[in-house]
């Protein structure tokens, strides 16, 4: 991974040592959190991760909790990003009152890795459904700023994950 980052193949992106560490950990670990404030290079890290997975012929899915965040990450990476709801193929249940997701443990997402941007805005219900839709072995890379807006729904997932000290977090 480091050799790719430092190769002539990709000299369009200059990463700091901490950004390189975030990229390497994301490629190697099953679950990774990347957190930092505005302007710390989170989007640059995301683009580097995508390029490495693409060089390995691995499919990566990009998503975010809101349409605005998905559009922003699409524009900055040049890769399609969807809202988490759209990625999970949401639909309304029988009586139009409950939301169901067609991507779940019975019909998981087909990818090697999934990158969730603006993770601070993801609530516990959406996170639960996203996790259900991941196949065993799918890498989960969560990116966000813990000091940004928390989710409207229940749960402060990103903050709780970081505080737990159980998942590799790069700041």
Task: Give, region by region, the residue ranges found by the protein language model.
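Conserved ATP-binding/catalytic motifs of P-loop helicase motor domains
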Residues: 1-171
